Curated annotation (Swiss-Prot):
UniProt subunit comment: Interacts with TEK/TIE2, competing for the same binding site as ANGPT1. Interacts with ITGA5. Interacts with SVEP1/polydom. Interacts with THBD; this interaction significantly inhibits the generation of activated PC and TAFIa/CPB2 by the thrombin/thrombomodulin complex.
Species this chain originates from: Bos taurus
An example molecular function term from Gene Ontology annotations: receptor tyrosine kinase binding
Protein name per Swiss-Prot or TrEMBL: Angiopoietin-2
Function of the protein: Binds to TEK/TIE2, competing for the ANGPT1 binding site, and modulating ANGPT1 signaling. Can induce tyrosine phosphorylation of TEK/TIE2 in the absence of ANGPT1. In the absence of angiogenic inducers, such as VEGF, ANGPT2-mediated loosening of cell-matrix contacts may induce endothelial cell apoptosis with consequent vascular regression. In concert with VEGF, it may facilitate endothelial cell migration and proliferation, thus serving as a permissive angiogenic signal. Involved in the regulation of lymphangiogenesis.
NCBIfam families for this protein: GGGWT_bact
Coiled-coil stretches: 167-249
PANTHER family found in the cross-reference section: FIBRINOGEN ALPHA CHAIN (PTHR47221:SF6)
UniProt domain comment: The Fibrinogen C-terminal domain mediates interaction with the TEK/TIE2 receptor.
Length: 496
């Protein structure tokens, strides 16, 4: 007979999973048989005793029958197996009923458990959902703030990007403009380089030509120096002869005066003629006022002296009374003279000449004089410069020129530099240049640092009078390279 010793019921509930089915097994543990039933998530385990002491009533009990070495009778074994089969069948039916009962009861419990679990799960899920909603709302708010910050930052970055883009476009435009300008400058530089090379070639040719002209001029200057030395010798001889002639003239004048004195005792008309011959003129203004109104050569005397000088008087221009102190008209007289020659004068008073610095200095030192410079170019144009006050210092001050009050048509600016400059000649360099202007520009003049004028320069004929540095020039009328055709310098008392 089987006895139920131990029954173990275990049920494990898992909400998340559900499994249906049954499993039966037989295990042997500690001398007992184990019977397990699986239904869904529940597991039922039964421990049954061994069947060693179960025997039929007709059989005698034999302890430890299983362990005996002698075999049982065949019939007895069959009976026992049949009994065991019956017992197993009964147990199986009983277990099936028990299983059905457990299943019926467990269904209700499972429904309740599942409902409770669902309710608990629902509450938990609602709570979790609420928390999630709250967290989501908080996260949404934070995301909104972050989004606003990101939007602001993005807007600011977009503005900066736009500004950078505009700056970049502006820089690109400037770079393009500069590139274009550089290209133009490169083209211009190439053109200038080519032009410079051409000019260098021309300059080399011109230098060669100038060198040849220089050699020719040096030869010509050497010849001219020889001629000048010869002329100086002749001039010295002529000066000596002139002194002799002046002495002879003086002796003749005394003889004539003696004769006139003797004749005046017998005829009064001769006495009147002698008085007329003894009239003395300091300048042409005095001669004009005395009734001599015809232009020509007159004899003038130095102030406070009996020394005489021949001068040309212009009695027609601007009311007359002009004493001509310089004239250039045809190039017949060489004006490249020494200091002494410019002091005493040279040339023909009726033609080209220089009256003399000493006479002009003494005359203009007595009272106020005006200076008029008349100019004529090769195209027939005429102009003049009139100075309201003019005088020359003495020889100790190198016949320094003084001018004031310029008017006229030969330029609004004086071509004779002011304040006064000293007079220079080829043998007396008194200019303000380290070079010798008189030798470079030829002629004697009131040079500054060579200056804007020289009316005593070299005379050049027509069609050879341009681009001449050493010609007869008056800068503020015709420029520095134009050599004039004719010039006249004349003085007259300011109170004439």
């Amino acid at each position: 007979m089987w006895q139920l010793v131990f029954l173990t019921l275990s049920c494990d509930l898992a909400v998340a999973t559900a499994h249906s089915g049954s499993r039966k097994g037989m295990d042997i543990a500690a001398g007992k048989k184990q019977y397990q039933v699986q239904h869904g998530a529940c597991s039922y385990t039964f421990l049954l005793p061994e069947t060693d002491h179960c025997r039929s009533p007709s059989s005698a009990y034999v302890p430890n029958a299983v362990q005996r070495d002698a075999p049982l009778d065949y019939d007895d074994s069959v009976q026992r197996l049949q009994v065991l089969e019956n017992i197993m069948e009964n147990n199986t039916q009983w277990l099936m009923k028990l299983e059905n009962y457990i299943q019926d009861n467990m269904k209700k419990e499972m429904v309740e458990i599942q409902q409770n679990a669902v309710q608990n799960q629902t509450a938990v899920m609602i709570e979790i959902g609420t928390n999630l909603l709250n967290q989501t709302a908080e996260q949404t708010r934070k995301l909104t703030d972050v989004e606003a910050q990101v939007l602001n930052q993005t807007t600011r970055l977009e503005l900066q990007l736009l500004e950078h883009s505009l700056s970049t476009n502006k820089l690109e435009k400037q770079i393009l403009d500069q590139t274009s300008e550089i290209s133009k400058l490169q083209d211009k530089n190439s053109f200038l380089e080519k032009k410079v090379l051409d000019m260098e070639d021309k300059h080399i040719v011109q230098l060669r030509s100038i060198k040849e002209e220089k050699d020719q001029l040096q030869v010509l200057v050497s010849k001219q120096n020889s001629i000048i030395e010869e002329l100086e010798k002749q001039l010295v001889t002529a000066t000596v002869n002139n002194s002799v002639l002046q002495k002879q003239q003086h002796d003749l004048m005394e003889t004539v005066n003696n004769l006139l004195t003797l004749m005046s005792t017998s005829n009064p008309s001769y006495s009147l003629l002698a008085k007329d011959e003894q009239i003395i003129f300091r300048d042409c203004g005095e001669a004009f006022k005395s009734g001599l109104t015809t232009s020509g050569v007159y004899t003038l005397t130095f102030p406070n002296s009996t020394e005489e000088i021949k001068a040309y008087c212009d009695m027609e221009t601007g009311g007359g009374g002009w004493t001509v102190i310089q004239r250039r008209e045809d190039g017949s007289v060489d004006f490249q003279r020494t200091w002494k020659e410019y002091k005493v004068g040279f040339g023909n008073p009726s033609g080209e000449h220089w009256l003399g610095n000493e006479f002009v200095s003494q005359v203009t030192g007595q009272k106020r004089y005006v200076l008029k410079i008349h100019l004529r170019d090769w195209e027939g144009n005429e102009a003049y410069s009139l100075y309201d006050h003019f005088y020359l210092s003495n020889e100790e001050l190198n016949y320094r020129i003084h001018l004031k009050g310029l008017t006229g048509t030969a330029g609004k600016i004086s071509s004779i530099s002011q304040p006064g400059n000293d007079f220079s000649t080829k043998d007396a360099d008194n200019d303000k240049c380290i070079c010798k202007c008189s030798q470079m520009l030829t002629g004697g003049w009131w040079f500054d640092a060579c200056g804007p004028s020289n009316l005593n320069g070299m005379y050049y004929p027509q069609r050879q009078n341009t681009n001449k540095f050493n010609g007869i020039k008056w800068y503020y009328w015709k420029g520095s390279g134009y050599s004039l055709k004719a010039t006249t310098m004349m003085i007259r008392p300011a109170d004439f």
